[in-house]
Amino acid sequence: IELAFDFVNALNHPERRARLEKRGLYDGRSFTKDSRIALVLAGYTEDEITGEYIKKLKRKRDKAATDAIFIEGVIGGSRRTENGKKIFSLWDTYVYADFVTYPSCWEGWGNQFLEALRAKLPIMLFEYPVFKADIEDKGFSVVSLGSELADSEDGLVLVPARKIEEAADQAVDLLTDFTLREEVVESNFKIGRRHYSLDALSKYLLPIIDGRQ
C-alpha cells in the first residue's frame, strides 16, 4: 500500500498538478489549485497481529502529508445499516474513483484486478509474481511500478524512484485524455471478458469434465 502513497505524492507534484490544471480531466471536470488527489483505502487492509503495518502507513502519510483516507470502517460486501450506521458497498467506491491502485507485493491471484477491469478504470500496479506468471501475457494495458522491491528505513518497501515518476506521468495522461483512457479501459475489459468471464470459464472446465485434460 505504501507504493500507492508514493504514486499519489508524485501525482501531487506541482508540475503534474499544473498539467492537470491546464488540460482538465477526462470527463470534462476542471482541475484547480484546490482540487485534491486523494488515495482512498476502501477495502480490507491486511495487517500483522500487532497492527504495526497500519501504524507505519499512517506515519508515512503524516510525514509526507499524503492525502490518504482510510474508510474501511464504512465499507462492506453490500449496502446495509449496522447499529444505525450506514455501510456502503465496495462497488459504491468504484463509482467515484478515477483510478485504481493495486500495489500488492504478493497475491494469491488478484480478484481486485478483475474488479478494476469490470469497473472500467485504469490500473496502477506492482508486478507481483502471480501477475507476471498468469496475467501479464494476456496483454492488459496497466501503469506499472515494475517488479523490483527494496526495503526502506521506515520498515516499509519502495520501488525505484524513476518507476514512480514514470507511473505518475502515465497517470496524468489517463486522467486528462478521454480518448486514450477509453481505449485502455475498453481494451482491458474485452481482454478480461475473453479470458476471465463465466463464458471463458467453460472453455477451461469442459476439457477437464470431458476427461480430455
Where are these regions (language model features)?
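A structural motif in glycosyltransferase catalytic domains
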Residues: I1-F7, L39, A116, A167, ...
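C-terminal "capping" alpha-helix adjacent to the active site of nucleotide-linked donor transferases
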Residues: S144-L180
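Short hydrophobic beta-strand element within catalytic cores of glycosyltransferases
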Residues: Y102, P122-L125, K132-E136, V142-S147
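Short alpha-helical segment that forms part of, or immediately flanks, the ligand-binding pocket
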Residues: W91, L114-R118, K132-A133
